[in-house]
Every structure is written in structure tokens, then in C-alpha cells.
Design a protein with these regions (language model features):
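Solvent-exposed edge beta-strands and adjacent loop segments
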Residues: 10-76, 124-137
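Short, low-complexity, polar/charged sequence segments that are solvent-exposed and flexible
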Residues: 90-96, 120-122, 143-145, 160-165
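Residue-level signal for secondary-structure boundary sites
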Residues: 81-83, 149-153
């Protein structure tokens, strides 16, 4: 006999280009919009939790610690990239950074250009610039997150969506 265990038999996989990350200094939340890093090749989010074991006569007892989160971003360096410069200055000055993880494959039920998102605050904890003779310059960033993040919906402009993936363009001038 066949039993269903809430398996999503007809689910679709989400392409990596549909998950985008947007960044903004917390100090600029009333004056500026969040931006994506140009030429992103890979992003990731990790959540981990350590635990301690205590030996008892009945076996070990585990005590979970506090969850810690990190977001990583790898991109090719764009000439004159002001966002990367701004993020590095924020690292030097211990400034809090806002980060949105947005799923462009899941539009919100209401509102134009709104998508399922997770919001975080944290600090840039590592920046690495790698250059070799054969490839483009690569920039890797690591953000240490505070708290667990909050689920919600984020607005992603048409321009930001176009940064994430090629969008079809007509042969006529824009607005014609």
C-alpha cells in the first residue's frame, strides 16, 4: 500500500539566480534603498548551533547553545563598485548592516515587485579580494548575523531584478 508523507511530488526546484541578497547600512535606512552586489556568483546562509554534553549515569544529556548565523557572498569585482567600498568602511567602523535574502521565485500575494524574504542585521566580519593572472578579480564577504532573522516580504525594484538575471528586452527603445 502506498502512503503519502506530505511529500511535494510536484514541487519545482528554485534556480540559484532566483535567490538574491540586498544590503544597506542600518544608518542609511531612512535615506537610501538596499542594493545588490554586482556580478554575484554565489551566496549562502549558514545557521549552526553548538551543544554541550554532560555525562550522567543514564547516558549523556545534551544542552543546546545559541544559534549563530552567517551569510556569505562571492562576486566578481565590478570597476568602481561603491557598495563594496561602503561595506568595507562599515566593517572598519563596526557599523551594523541590514541584509535581505529575497526569493524572486515566490512573489507576495499583494503588492508590485514584492517577494518572500528574510531580513537580518549583522556585521561584515571578513572581506577577501583574490586576483590571479588568468581570472577576474573575485571578492568574498562574510557577514556575522545577530539574532535569527525575521520572515516577511521585500520590495525588489525592476532594476534589482534585472541585476539578478537577464530580463527580456524588446527591440524598440525603452518606453517606445
Amino acid at each position: 500500500m502506498f502512503r503519502m508523507f506530505r511529500l511535494q511530488m510536484f514541487a519545482e526546484a528554485i534556480a540559484g539566480t532566483k535567490i538574491v541578497y540586498l544590503y544597506r547600512l542600518l544608518s542609511k535606512q531612512s535615506t537610501g534603498s538596499a542594493s545588490g552586489i554586482a556580478f554575484a556568483t554565489e551566496n549562502g546562509r549558514t545557521k549552526s548551533k553548538d551543544s554541550d554534553s554532560t555525562a550522567t549515569k543514564d547516558g549523556s544529556v545534551r544542552t543546546p547553545g545559541v544559534a549563530e548565523g552567517e551569510i556569505t557572498s562571492t562576486s566578481l569585482l565590478a570597476q568602481g563598485d561603491a557598495l563594496l567600498d561602503e561595506l568595507e568602511k562599515a566593517m572598519d567602523n563596526n557599523e551594523l548592516i541590514e541584509v535581505w535574502e529575497v526569493n524572486l521565485a515566490e512573489p507576495a500575494e499583494e503588492g508590485d515587485n514584492k517577494f518572500k524574504a528574510k531580513y537580518f542585521q549583522g556585521y561584515l566580519t571578513e572581506k577577501e579580494v583574490t586576483s590571479n593572472a588568468e581570472d577576474n578579480v573575485e571578492v568574498s564577504l562574510t557577514f556575522g548575523l545577530q539574532g535569527n532573522g525575521v520572515d516577511g516580504e521585500a520590495t525588489v525594484t525592476q532594476t534589482q531584478q534585472e541585476m539578478a538575471a537577464y530580463v527580456f528586452k524588446d527591440t524598440q527603445p525603452a518606453g517606445a
